[in-house]
């Protein structure tokens, strides 16, 4: 019996942590390289995915945990840059509302392992409705790979750490590569992205100093607006998974609808506020929090 040979994206040696204290740290430092590699073995796949998306009447995108947060970002960037509407769906919820999906739609499924039971169940429901499946997956020998009409490989190597780090970066990179193909007016410099992350992580002392201050905190709130809101949700998930501290991502504009009542001198708030269209409004939210005595970490 002849079996087809599948080439994996990385070497088995990448499953060793080397001189790093733990795998998560190693995988954080691999992110600059991941940006350059994500999707590089699936250029034809990206082009085919773009054709599906261009001709789609309805597009859904699903995932669990970090992959769902990537789906939320996909909704924002596809709408903003190429005016394409996408509906994110939590994989575990679809079985309770399968009527959400229209027949003959495009269904994008994201999973690092390609073996998440909830994601595979969501794909099963979508295939039953004659949807075309675009699989964004790291493990190219996985069940999700086999179920995809188009497969986009993250190509980020083994992810041993419990918390998704480099695979999240790979997922977002692939989504931006799709956008670049969808629009003739957008040019994205992925090398510049890679260099920016390298600069950010090359001097960890400031981050370590902040981490020591947060060591005994029991609650952390993370705020953001626009595309920074799903980043806040993902940041909160990382804190919960790795530190066992209660962390919550909040849309900064919703601060006055409940969360502001929790702000006092014992609370730490991380505010994601780059110099974009959300900057001024988010700064106003920061002032409201500061007035109640909460400690603020600005990103």
Regions found by a protein language model. Name each.
Residues 2-6, 142-148, 204, 253, ...:
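Short, functional N-terminal and low-complexity linear motifs
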Residues 11, 90-91, 251:
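Short, solvent-exposed coil/turn linker segments
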Residues 23-60, 150-268, 278:
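Active-site phosphate/pyrophosphate-binding segments
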Residues 51-195, 225, 238, 272-299:
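Glycine-rich phosphate-binding loops that contact phosphosugars or nucleotide phosphates
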Residues 1-32:
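Intein/HINT protein-splicing elements and their conserved insertion hotspots or analogous self-processing inserts
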